[in-house]
Structure formats: C-alpha cells, structure tokens
C-alpha cells in the first residue's frame, strides 16, 4: 500500500478522511494539497492544515448557496464538517484546548447546513438519557423514490472510541439511504458533543446507553416516521463494534453488525507491552507511579502513544495511564457475554489492522456466538486496503456498505430485482 505519511498513525488518519471521497466527505485534490502542508508527527501542523481547508470548503459552500446551487452547497458543507472534525482530532492529548470545542461545534454546524440539502429527510433529536441530560440523535429517512415496500427498515448506529455523529454519516446513512434503509445515529457519553460539552464519560455497560436510545426510538420516533421495528439492526465500527455487541442482547434489536471490534480491549493493549512490565504492574511489583512514569516517558517520544493515552484519559474520565488500563479491563466480551446474543449477527475483521487483528478478536467473537444457529451468524475478514483490511474498513467504505446491506437484505428478507 502506498503511504502518504511515513507515520502509520498519521497515514491511517489521512486515509480515514480520503476514504470518504465517494460520499462527499472529502475531495482528493483538497486532501493531497492539505497533506503537503502537514509535518509528519506534528499535531499542530495537522490542525492548521485541516482548519484552513475546512474554512475553504465552507466558503465554497456559502458561495454555492448564494447562487442556488443546492448540490454544490450540500457537498461542500459536508466536506467542511469532515475537515473540521479532522482538524481537532490530534489535539486530544490536551482536552482543555479551546480549539477542540470550537472545531467540533463548527463541524456540527456545517453538517447541519449540509444535511438539509440532502436528497433525503433528516431530523435532529434530543434523546432523554438521565435526569435532565439529553443525547443528540439524528434520523435519516430515504427519499420517496428510494423507499422499499412497507415500513422502513432501520439501522441504529453507534459511534466508538473517537468518532463523532457527523462522521458516522459516511459509514451508515451514505450507504443506507439509496438502499431504502433509515438510519438513527447518536452520540453517547464519551463521544461527540456529550463529551466535549456535557463532560459525559464513556460507559463500559453500553447496553444501558442503547436501551435509553431504543426507548426513545420505539416510543417516539418509529410511530411518527413509519419505521419497521421488526427490521431494526444495530451497527458500530472499531470500538463501536464492541459497543454494538454489548447492545445486541436487547431483544428489540433484530440484527447486529459488528465491524472490526475488539474482544477484550485490555488484552490487546497488554499484547503491545513488554510482558515483564505489564505483568509486573498487574501483580503489584510495578507500582502505579513507576508505570505512569514509564508511559509518560514514552509519550514524550511517540505521538501515537501520547494520543492514545491522552484521548483515553479524556474519554474515560481518569487522570493516569494506569487508570486508563483499569477501565480497559472492563471492556471485554469474555465471561459468557457473547452467549447472551440471540439476534442474527455479522462479525467483520480487518486482516491488516494494527489494532484489532482477527486472530484474537473477530474469529474468537464469531466462535463465541454459541446461541446462534450457523445460518444466523456470518464472518467476513477484509484483506488489503481495497478490500476492507484496515481497521474499521478505512478506505473501503463502499465495500462495507455492500457487504453489510447485502447481509441485512438477506436477514430481513428484502428482495431486490436483479439488474
């Protein structure tokens, strides 16, 4: 695979943007020009370059809107939203940086201006969560000429460790709408604006979060918008793949698509550390103080490690690397949890992932679905960047759309004419 950046981390995040080109999330020329302004490994240059490109895309959107070019305005606003999202992404080592919230709000604002121009109906919602706390949700409905017979099948889409609801559009609604599916996406605690504004931290019992969302969808949204609750699937990618499996125990979910999720997040992190060091910490021989000192030293020379622990502390609401690992120990599908899943399930893996390799994740998750008949579970391992081999199917979103909706069509008995 050709690399734009020598750093695997920077290259992956660049491909994350470039991979949205088919769905108006980026323009090839804009991305290549922006890449030329970024110093590999330097988050400040990354921020400035994508901020500048976001402003340019937003200006194009406003120019198009001023002359009534609905399509041009829609596409440019959606690109701007994605560039704004990318600009603040590598600043997460310092969550109090005001540029994070400013860029996040700019991303949401640009996306809200873009979706009203889509060939679809889109509605924003506030989902009751706890006490007076509400979570942002968004319903995408297919245009009349894309509707399937009967009520509308719907995909409930959850984010993951570092996504935002606006980015989820490219993974879900962009492929669902032309196929006649509705999508209901949301940002939960530890994600998007609930993290940045509400300071809500990610919950490891994600099934609780999804139960609140499902209450709202089934009671308030589905009746008004003709959603088919007998054809309701959940979908998540990367850590979202894990979160979707946590939620799949709810009987209201009729199918689950878990894209490249982990079996046990702590065990994956553990495998990347010297055995004597991590085992020493687990046994108490290495104290928290020593562990934190070593990790902090590594973050000074390795930006990827700095970002992973910095973002982890922010999302989990903890102060030290040792505490990050303690939260990770709770992010696991071991101990019989997979046996509770009764709905048809599609598990995907990424052969070339540098995070969640299939041998210790997708393959074991698939085998753990013991309550399902062979015909009710399916495993797909993507290979190569063009075939879904990178984590979360980066660079192959059209491929994952094809695989996912072909499987959902079969699961929900949706018949289409052969072309």
UniProtKB/Swiss-Prot annotation:
InterPro entries: AB_hydrolase_fold, FrsA-like, FrsA_esterase. Pathway: Mycotoxin biosynthesis. The keyword Hydrolase applies. It comes from the Eukaryota. PANTHER family: ALPHA_BETA HYDROLASE PSOB, DIENELACTONE HYDROLASE DOMAIN-CONTAINING PROTEIN-RELATED. One of its GO terms (molecular function) is hydrolase activity. Disruption phenotype: Accumulates 20-hydroxy-prefusarin. The active site is at residue 238. The keyword Metal-binding does not apply. Keywords: Hydrolase. Belongs to the AB hydrolase superfamily. FUS2 hydrolase family. Its EC number is 3.7.1.-. It is an enzyme of class 3 (hydrolase). Induction: Expressed under high amounts of nitrogen via regulation by GLN1. Moreover, components of the fungal-specific velvet complex VEL1, VEL2 and LAE1 act also as positive regulators of expression. Finally, expression is induced under acidic conditions in a PACC-independent manner. This is 20-hydroxy-prefusarin hydrolase FUS2. The lineage of its organism: Eukaryota, Fungi, Dikarya, Ascomycota, Pezizomycotina. 20-hydroxy-prefusarin hydrolase; part of the gene cluster that mediates the biosynthesis of the mycotoxin fusarin C. Within the cluster, FUS1, FUS2, FUS8 and FUS9 are sufficient for fusarin production. The roles of the other FUS members are yet undetermined. The fusarin C synthetase FUS1 is responsible for the condensation of one acetyl-coenzyme A (CoA) unit with six malonyl-CoA units and the amide linkage of the arising heptaketide and homoserine, subsequently releasing the first intermediate, prefusarin, as an alcohol with an open ring structure. Pfam families: FrsA-like.
